[in-house]
Each structure stands twice: as C-alpha cells, then as structure tokens.
C-alpha cells in the first residue's frame, strides 16, 4: 500500500451520508483528511426550506466523531454569478437547464478545488459522488459508479481529466446500501438521513413557487398540437418541460379519449404551450439531436464519427447512437431508435461501456 499519510485530502462535507462515509473511507486508506462545508446559497426568508444550518450541524457532528477538522467557506456570490443567473437565463429562453451539472462545473470542481489547493494546501479533494476514477496512460478517466441506481457520472461530464486527477470518489466503488451500513455501524449522525432531493438552492419547496419569485408569470394559451384546439391556459412556459404530464390543468376532454396529455413543444416567440395525447405521440419523439458547449473528459475534440451510447437525462437507459462532429464545437447525434422527450437545455452525455466520454447541451432535437 502506498503511503498516503503525507497526502492531504479535503472532503466536501454536505451533511449527507455519502460524504460522511467518504471521509471515513479516506481515513481508513491512511490519508490526512479534513472536511469543508460549502455554503452556496444565502437564505433570506426561507429558513424553513433551507437546510443549510441542519446540514452544517450534521457535517460538524460527523467530523467530530471521526476526529477531523471541518472548514467552512461561502461560495454564494460565485454560485449566484456562475450558476443561478445562467439557470434563470435558460428558463427565460424556454429551455430546461440542469443546475446540478452547472454547480459541479463552477463550484464543486472549480471554486472548491481551487480553494482546497490554494488556501488549505490539499493534494486532492473528495466528494460523495457515485462515480469512479481510472487512470490510464497518465490520464484520468471518469467511470460510472458501481451502483447502477446511483451512478452520478451524468452530472460530472464537464470535468476534465486534470480535474478528475485531483479528485477522489471513495463511495463510487460501493453500492448505496453498503454506504448506509458503514454509517450505521459507525453510528454517524447522518446514517439514517434521507437523500436530498430537488435542486440544491430550492430544497424541498415547490419549484413553481420558487421560480415565480425571480421570473414573472407570463400566461398564455395551451393548444393541442394536432388541431390547434385551445386546451387551457399556462402561467408561463418556464414552468413546463417537454414530456411533462402533471400540472397542465387539462382534465377530461370531450371526445378526448383516455390517454393523458403531455407537453410536446413550446413556441417561445408566441408564448404557446403545445400538448398532445399519449407518451408516444410523434411530436414527442426525436430521432436525434444537435448538441453544443461540448466538454470531452480527455479534452480532445471529436474529429471523426463515433459509435457510443448517450443519455439525454439522468437515470435514462443508455441509447445506442452515432455522433458526428459538425465543426464549430457542435455535434449531431442520431439515435438507433426514437427517443421521447429530448429537451433543449438539458445535457446529452456519452459513454463507451463504463467510461463517461463527456457531453454537451442539447441545442435542438431532430424529429426527422
């Protein structure tokens, strides 16, 4: 076993079970471990929704139990400028961004990585993400986590091989039940804490209520895509995403049959929300997509056609596809089979077996 005791690792302690067990596992591997709690959002009047105080207390309790120092840092300004404002801009444009991907890119593997290295003298950072790192020929690769249900590589595709080389992912080799078991055996404060859901800055509150504070409601018509028949009113296109079924306010429609209604398109210029019946309606299906803002983990641009698999959203089954470079940092992706609810603003992430190659932002879906 290599001597890790000279190596300092700063673990991003979120107050959750995964980062808690990560800190313990790194201790067991002999590293000098310290924790860092990041505050990325300034609560104003939302204390009942914001769990930051509880999370910090839980992180502190775990660090006390493990006998490690816990540092704190406030990245709220960086988060607002580099994550939240972009998130709002995308919603205003009628797209559906993924703030967790942005947060990993701008905060956890940029602001945190720089702070840990420069201010705390870290050799590595570590997080509780369910991914694995594999070094080949001097380059670090990003692999899916061993737990297929929890794999989080989709959210980390923007990382470069250099960033991965500076990062450790201890729970990526484990399955979630094993992680909980370790926490319970150690009697860590976070052992039974449920996984956080929802977007980090929104917490458990209703998404539409949160968005309404920053983006004014813009009501407009809901039309049936098949015959332009009025189906109701929406309160704002930003509250709806392609493939959405709930929250449309369309009940039983005369002569409408039993199939539920789905969002199939948004006309941003005219503020129209288009819906159709059935989850396999042709307007919901795509044969491919065009992606931009590409990030390849090895940082080598794609120069030739590539056969691989793609995910257009988290937890989706892998879709076999062919990727073709278009130049100007864009690619065309053609699926072997049509895919439902491919959503502009979301990320398309590419894989070869367990290796995450990288990805990009979906610019448009191809329906032919």
Swiss-Prot record:
It comes from Pectobacterium carotovorum subsp. carotovorum (strain PC1). Residues 150-152, 313-314 are annotated as: Interaction with tRNA. HAMAP family: tRNA_thiouridyl_MnmA (MF_00144). The record marks 129, 346 as: Interaction with tRNA. The gene is mnmA. Disulfide bonds join 103-200. Interacts with TusE. GO terms for molecular function: ATP binding; tRNA binding; tRNA-uridine 2-sulfurtransferase activity. GO terms for biological process: tRNA wobble position uridine thiolation. It is an enzyme of class 2 (transferase). InterPro entries: MnmA-like (IPR004506), MnmA-like_C (IPR046885), MnmA-like_central (IPR046884), MnmA-like_central_sf (IPR023382), Rossmann-like_a/b/a_fold (IPR014729). Residues 98-100 are annotated as: Interaction with target base in tRNA. Catalyzes the 2-thiolation of uridine at the wobble position (U34) of tRNA(Lys), tRNA(Glu) and tRNA(Gln), leading to the formation of s(2)U34, the first step of tRNA-mnm(5)s(2)U34 synthesis. Sulfur is provided by IscS, via a sulfur-relay system. Binds ATP and its substrate tRNAs. ATP binds at residues 12-19, 38, 128. The active site is at residues 103, 200. Its EC number is 2.8.1.13. PANTHER family: MITOCHONDRIAL TRNA-SPECIFIC 2-THIOURIDYLASE 1, TRNA 5-METHYLAMINOMETHYL-2-THIOURIDYLATE -METHYLTRANSFERASE. It is found in: Cytoplasm. It catalyses: S-sulfanyl-L-cysteinyl-[protein] + uridine(34) in tRNA + AH2 + ATP = 2-thiouridine(34) in tRNA + L-cysteinyl-[protein] + A + AMP + diphosphate + H(+). Pfam families: tRNA_Me_trans, tRNA_Me_trans_C, tRNA_Me_trans_M. Belongs to the MnmA/TRMU family. Keywords: ATP-binding, Cytoplasm, Disulfide bond, Nucleotide-binding, RNA-binding, Transferase, tRNA processing, tRNA-binding. One of its GO terms (cellular component) is cytoplasm. This is tRNA-specific 2-thiouridylase MnmA.
């Amino acid at each position: 076993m290599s001597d890790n005791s000279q190596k300092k690792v700063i673990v991003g302690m979120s107050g959750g079970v995964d980062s808690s067990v990560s800190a313990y596992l790194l201790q067991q591997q002999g590293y000098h471990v310290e924790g860092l709690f990041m505050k990325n959002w300034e609560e104003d009047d939302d204390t009942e929704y914001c769990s930051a105080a509880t999370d910090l207390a839980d992180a502190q309790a775990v660090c006390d139990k493990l006998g490690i120092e816990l540092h704190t840092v406030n990245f709220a300004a960086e988060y607002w400028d580099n994550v939240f404002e972009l998130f709002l801009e995308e919603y205003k444009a009628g797209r559906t961004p993924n703030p967790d991907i942005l947060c990993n890119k701008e905060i956890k593997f940029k602001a945190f990585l720089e702070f840990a290295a420069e201010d705390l003298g870290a050799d590595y950072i570590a997080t509780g993400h369910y991914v694995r790192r594999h070094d080949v020929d001097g380059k670090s690769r990003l692999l899916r986590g061993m737990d297929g249900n929890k794999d989080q590589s989709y959210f980390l595709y923007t990382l470069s091989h250099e960033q991965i080389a500076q990062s450790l992912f201890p729970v990526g080799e484990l399955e979630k039940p094993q992680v909980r078991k370790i926490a319970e055996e150690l009697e860590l404060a976070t052992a039974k804490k449920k996984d956080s859901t929802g977007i980090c800055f929104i917490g458990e509150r209703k998404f539409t209520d949160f968005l309404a504070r920053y983006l004014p409601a813009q009501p407009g018509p809901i039309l049936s895509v098949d015959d332009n028949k009025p189906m109701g009113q929406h309160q704002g296109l930003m509250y709806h995403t392609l493939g959405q079924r709930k929250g449309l306010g369309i009940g039983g429609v005369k002569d409408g049959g039993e199939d539920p209604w789905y969002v199939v398109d948004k006309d941003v210029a005219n503020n129209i929300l288009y819906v159709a019946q059935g989850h396999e309606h042709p307007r919901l299906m795509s044969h491919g997509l065009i992606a931009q803002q590409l990030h390849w983990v090895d940082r080598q641009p794609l120069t030739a056609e590539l056969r691989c698999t793609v995910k257009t959203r988290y937890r989706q089954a892998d879709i076999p596809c062919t990727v073709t470079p278009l130049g100007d940092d864009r690619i065309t992706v053609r699926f072997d089979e049509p895919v439902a609810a491919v959503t502009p603003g979301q990320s398309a992430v590419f894989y070869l077996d367990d290796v995450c190659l990288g990805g990009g932002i979906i610019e448009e879906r191809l329906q032919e």
